[in-house]
Amino acid sequence: GVIRSSYPCYIQYEYEQPFTCRNIEIVLNGNNYQAHRLKVMASDDGVNYRLVKQLVPARQGWQNTDEHSTHSIPPTTARFFRFYWTPEGSEPGSEDMDAAKWKPNLKIKELRLHREARLNQWEGKVGLVWRVAQATKEEEVGKQDCYSLSQVINLTKQYTGHSNGKTLTATLPKGKWKLLRMGHTATGHTNATAGGGKGLECDKFNPKTVRKQFDNWFAQAFVKTNPEIARRVLKYMHVDSWECGSQNWNKRFAIEFQKRRGYDLMPYLPLLAGIPMESVEQSEKILRDVRTTISELVVDV
């Protein structure tokens, strides 16, 4: 189900034992600007509440539903958490806040409270979806919450065998480890108004795949009609609406990143899952480099 309200309200979570929350994951059924305007309060007795944080929505376009949103908060230990909402103070809609143009109505599918540190609004910062969010604050993710490079071991070369029967064989130093498996695949977005050419979106970082799509769709106008007339009539191709979601990886992304940014991204790969590394300042800088590389690759194509 979905929690809905047009009037001031709050959602309350109660735990049997004190729980330490470090971030809040907001799950929606569609796009809802109001769900990211919650005021987070905490209490030890369910009577006296203290302010934890006023959530701030990321700047966003209309195609904002591919990923959830994770808001980091100062580490807070409490038995009761309240999430207050009011329509008062809502901003008007704009090109970079499309969802705000609708009448203020709160719609939330889930609120997930997590104890592990994550970068603020990391889903947009890693390029999974177009968003522009506030930087993570040190009071929310401290140095002690960040993994250092010495704590990360790349086990890829120890993962052997065929695709359907690979085996990981590794000897790790003593301690408690987390196994993080990362890969890449299509986002599932398909091209719209494509007629018989409908299918998965092509790799926007690869000039060859973009050229193949162009030659077999738009450029067919030169093949199917009189070429001389087509050359006089069709002089430009204008993209008036980007409706293919986001892309943040392909087979050559790590290579292009190192060539353009001057350092290896692979040791910092956990950042692409929102896991803070070294420091919040360093984490934000590297993810800014990721987004810059994404932009350059699309432009270069």
Regions found by a protein language model. Name each.
Residues 55-59, 68, 98-99, 128, ...:
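Short secondary-structure boundary/capping segments
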Residues 10, 23-26, 66-70, 96-98, ...:
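Short alpha-helical segments and helix-capping/turn motifs at coil-helix boundaries
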Residues 180-202, 250-293:
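Aromatic- and acidic-residue-enriched carbohydrate-binding clefts of CAZyme catalytic domains
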Residues 1-49, 53, 67-142, 241:
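Aromatic, loop-rich ligand-recognition surfaces of beta-strand-rich domains
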Residues 85-91, 95-223:
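Catalytic and substrate-binding clefts that recognize carbohydrates or anionic sugar/phosphate headgroups
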Residues 227-234:
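Short helix-terminating capping/connector loops at secondary-structure junctions
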